[in-house]
């Protein structure tokens, strides 16, 4: 099945501590999760790695969110939207369900 949320899509978080925040998808994991820029930040305790000249400390990084907890953001309507698929000129493309506009 084709992915409804893809890398570089702008999405909005539907549930959780970051509800309502928007961000760009950095990575889509095969486990049904996505990593979004600046969303779901967690503190990771990093050990120093002298061989790579990396210092230790507490680092903030993005954690994965379930893909069901985010929705693609439709800039035309300014709201979260659902994604559908259709064929145009022999190619399968994604479109917004609210206004039938093709997603780039």
UniProtKB/Swiss-Prot annotation:
Q: Which UniProt keywords apply?
A: Ribonucleoprotein, Ribosomal protein, RNA-binding, rRNA-binding
Q: Which family does it belong to?
A: Belongs to the universal ribosomal protein uL24 family.
Name used for this protein in its record: Large ribosomal subunit protein uL24
A single Gene Ontology biological process assigned to it is: translation
**GO cellular component, as recorded:** cytosol; ribonucleoprotein complex; ribosome
Q: Which InterPro entries does the record match to this protein?
A: KOW, Rib_uL2_dom2, Ribosomal_uL24, Ribosomal_uL24_CS, Ribosomal_uL24_KOW, Translation_prot_SH3-like_sf
Q: What is the annotated quaternary arrangement, including any partners?
A: Part of the 50S ribosomal subunit.
GO MF terms held by the record: rRNA binding; structural constituent of ribosome
- Could you tell me which Pfam families the record lists for this protein? KOW, ribosomal_L24
Q: Which organism is it from?
A: Shigella flexneri
Protein's job: One of two assembly initiator proteins, it binds directly to the 5'-end of the 23S rRNA, where it nucleates assembly of the 50S subunit. One of the proteins that surrounds the polypeptide exit tunnel on the outside of the subunit.
């Amino acid at each position: 099945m084709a992915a409804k949320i893809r890398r570089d899509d702008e999405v909005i978080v539907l549930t959780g501590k970051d509800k309502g925040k928007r961000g760009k998808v950095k990575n889509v994991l095969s486990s049904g999760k996505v990593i979004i820029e600046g969303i779901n930040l967690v503190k990771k305790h990093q050990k120093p790695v002298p061989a790579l000249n990396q210092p230790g400390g507490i680092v903030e990084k993005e954690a994965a969110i379930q893909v069901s907890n985010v929705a693609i953001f439709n800039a035309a309507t300014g709201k979260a939207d659902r994604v559908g698929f259709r064929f145009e000129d022999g190619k399968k493309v994604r479109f917004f369900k609210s206004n039938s506009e093709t997603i780039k």
